[in-house]
């Protein structure tokens, strides 16, 4: 009575559990279904593509247009948590960027020259000018955004109205605001590049009227940008000169001491001053054959009439005047060269005895030998070189280091002097040292393959499938296989029981079959006798003659 009451009050979950235990097929089906579901889920998870960012920081208009295009192209996408960036499968990122760029996406917050394609007929000149200014601002912003550290940019142009009066003309100005990537900054060269980019894109805009500000409100442009640019160029040029001399020294010494057994460092002092020199030289006409006559003037005056005797008494006044000579035999004074004073020759032929007098004046002007030389000095001339060279010990056959001899060091020093262009006039210095090198691990610059990102990605992809196989093996070992083993054992036991039952039944049937066969034979015999007697009765009733003949035959057979 109590057992019946306890069975009646047993809760339903326990009843279901007892039913499951009583029927071994149900746990097997449940375990198999769970294993298949887990394996399918793991396979789908392993096949899930790796998503990468396609675009980020998009406006709502660009984001909607890109999502519509991705849906039309049947490309799966998702939105990153928090940032709202659009992510697509990693193997399709570059292809989608090119395909979307072909369609003009994303357009960005600023509009470019495509704004001019939408102008309507009859637009006013003011609206046309405003649209052009907006388009120019948008194009400049897009160009600035192509720089690596720049996340976004905005450009504002102040274009004054043109005026016919020079005093009223004003230069345009520009203001540029850039939003930089986290942890990035613009160096001085990039700032100067942005300033000159905007200045060159707008007619009449000087670089000094361009203001560049970052997202924190820091002014990036300064008035002395040209000096900074020049310093950067000077530093780069100095590094190039030093590197070129260093390569020369190492290239000429490496065949002697071996690759990696020589190191050189060069310090070059360069003169970047802009120097120009103008010289003007004057030289006298020392060679009469090379003198060049510029002009000659000859004046002769003659007077005829009575006159009084004149001149110095004596034989000297009766002699003729000496011939005129060019003043090229004797160098002229500096004052004469500077003023180019003509030389005058005067002769007077007077005869105290006659009434006739003649006066002759001849002036000859010669070109002055003048030389003007204008020399512009090279910028970046080498003023002084300082070179330090370290040569490794040579290694013997047994691996022991051996220092170089004095003759070998002298030879290396001479070769280094020739390679560097050593000059005592400049005050160059050279120091060559022979010292053993320490062992250096040259593989430190490159990460091992197991630390490279590509190997890590491949390892993660393989780990997914390995995890799927491990989970499937665990499910097979812990859930499916025991149920199958139990099922096989139960089926085998049932089969053995059925076989024993069948053998028992066959033995019983064998024992029963003998009695049944005897009884059946007897019953058949009785049935046959009854059938024969019935047929004999029918034959005797129907044809008594035949019956009489048969009986007579039987009787005759008995007598015989």
Swiss-Prot record:
Keywords of this entry: Bacterial flagellum, Cell inner membrane, Cell membrane, Membrane, Transmembrane, Transmembrane helix
Induction of the gene: Inhibited in nutrient-poor medium.
Function: The M ring may be actively involved in energy transduction.
Biased composition (Polar residues): 354-366
Gene Ontology process terms (BP): bacterial-type flagellum-dependent cell motility
Top-level division of the source organism's lineage: Bacteria
Compositional bias ranges of the Low complexity kind: 331-353
Location within or outside the cell: Cell inner membrane; Bacterial flagellum basal body
Keyword Transmembrane helix: yes
Annotated region described as Disordered, given as residue ranges: 304-372
GO terms, molecular function: cytoskeletal motor activity
Pfam families: YscJ_FliF, YscJ_FliF_C
Oligomeric and partner information: The basal body constitutes a major portion of the flagellar organelle and consists of four rings (L,P,S, and M) mounted on a central rod. The M ring is integral to the inner membrane of the cell and may be connected to the flagellar rod via the S ring. The S (supramembrane ring) lies just distal to the M ring. The L and P rings lie in the outer membrane and the periplasmic space, respectively.
Membrane-protein topology: Multi-pass membrane protein
One Gene Ontology cellular component annotation held by this UniProt entry: plasma membrane
Annotated family: Belongs to the FliF family.
Chain segments annotated as transmembrane: 26-46, 455-475
Protein's gene: fliF
Full protein name: Flagellar M-ring protein
Primary location group: membrane
